[in-house]
Amino acid sequence: PTRRSSDLEKTDADGYDAKEFDLTLGYSTGGFSVSITDYWYNTGAGYFHYGAHNTTHLYEAQVGYDFGPVAVNWYTNFAGDDGVKENGDRAYSSYISIAAPFKLGGLDWTAEVGATPWETDFYGASGFAVCDVSLGATKDIRITNSFSLPLFAKATWNPCSERAYFVVGLSF
């Protein structure tokens, strides 16, 4: 599970929905996991612009533990195009999620609830706010005996922003 970047209202200079490119480096052992993700949007400075005040990259750290029936993850934006507090200070926008996986109809499902613990305009929250209630499914689509594509789909409702999203993709 990762942060719901689809919850962000991003448009390019012409007002079209922004394109997003995410790179994640992670490690897990047993139930413990840790990762760093670079989220990039085509909403301003080009891909190779990493300046403190002219980047559209966002860097996020994750730490979590999968207890079996429930997984708990904490995410914090630590650099890049993060949100701010009302006073203008960097918010170090953070997010905690609790996810419960289950199997149904030949698919792997996950029900998830997530919240931001403090004020940040990144998530549009003035304090603690539930910003993710979601249901997702994954299925490996077999192409050959030795190769399959891991397809996922997820429906998300954000009570804080009163918006809903549907995401489909592939995981590698």
Language model segments and positions:
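Residues that define the transmembrane beta-barrel architecture of outer-membrane proteins
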Residues: 17-21, 55-61, 66-68, 88-96, ...
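Hydrophobic, well-structured mid-protein blocks that either form specific transmembrane helices
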Residues: 40-93
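Surface-exposed loop and membrane-interface regions of Gram-negative outer-membrane beta-barrel proteins
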Residues: 6-28, 33-53, 124-127
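Structural signature of outer-membrane beta-barrel channels/translocons
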Residues: 26-30, 64-70, 99-105, 138-144, ...
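Outer-membrane beta-barrel pore domains and translocons
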Residues: 8-12, 28, 37-41, 75-79, ...
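Short, small-residue-biased leader/transition segments that mark boundaries at the very start
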Residues: 1-5
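Outer membrane beta-barrel transmembrane domains
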Residues: 108-143
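Outer-membrane beta-barrel "beta-signal"
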Residues: 77, 135, 141, 161-172
